[in-house]
Design a protein with these regions (language model features):
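Conserved GNAT-fold acetyl-CoA-binding loop/helix
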Residues: 36-58, 70-72
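Acyl-donor (CoA/ACP) binding surface of acyl/acetyltransferases
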Residues: 1-35, 75-212
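Short loop/turn motifs at secondary-structure junctions and domain boundaries
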Residues: 62-68
Length: 212
């Protein structure tokens, strides 16, 4: 039974999702240092270019080869500019489930890229990898992330009280950790009936070696 994700590229009408590479270092560092990323994710701060190189060269490959997950750069098809990141984590190969999360660069918000990339990834997981469940967790006050989950057809399953550590600006400009709730969403193959039809017609899955 497959227990690691392949090196994959996924294309939609506007985006290409692919493995991170050295050319992404500067844009990845800039994206990860954004205040919204700091507030709602566990990405260590400050996140400099050295941290970006370690993420690309060590963390992301290790997650994939160990079977825990997959990191995909989200890039614009026409410009090849990095506009986000899709992550799979906590993968259970027996249950065929994984946890999906997404980050959108501040220069690319409001374009619908997060939902397009998340839907493309979900479609690939269900059709190509034969997964049966995708889980998403969002901080209770992270309404933008919740809107993405709802837009791609996720079903809200409930609240994990006090399970999330977010960060908030203090009066002196520093960041303080704040405990809050997680809202848990799930997506099953049947949830994409209708909602994923447009992508199913336009999406393409290729090995990264073929695409590169």
């Amino acid at each position: 039974m497959t227990s690691t994700f392949p090196n994959i590229s996924i294309s939609t009408e506007r985006l290409v999702l692919r493995p991170l590479d050295e050319d992404d270092v500067t844009a990845l560092a800039d994206m990860m240092n954004d205040e919204q990323v700091t507030a709602w994710t566990a990405v260590p701060q400050p996140f400099d270019e050295a941290a970006a190189r370690r993420w690309i060269a060590e963390y992301a490959p290790d997650e994939r080869t160990a079977g825990r997950g997959l990191d995909l750069a989200v890039t614009e098809f026409l410009t090849q500019r990095l506009v986000g990141l899709v992550q799979l984590a906590k993968t259970d190969w027996h249950v065929r489930s994984t946890e999906l999360s997404y980050i959108t660069a501040p220069w690319a918000r409001g374009e619908g890229y997060a939902s397009e990339a998340a839907l493309a990834t979900a479609q690939w997981l269900f059709t190509d990898q034969k997964f049966e469940r995708i889980e998403l967790r969002t901080a209770a006050d992270n309404t933008a992330s919740q809107q993405v989950a709802q837009k791609i057809g996720c079903i809200s399953e409930g609240v994990l009280r006090g399970a999330c550590i977010a960060r908030a600006r203090a009066g002196d400009g520093s960041w303080n950790e704040v405990r809050t709730d997680y809202i848990v969403y799930s997506l099953l193959p049947e949830d994409l009936d209708g909602g994923g039809e447009h992508f199913a017609e336009s999406g393409e899955f290729t090995s990264y070696a073929d695409w590169n």
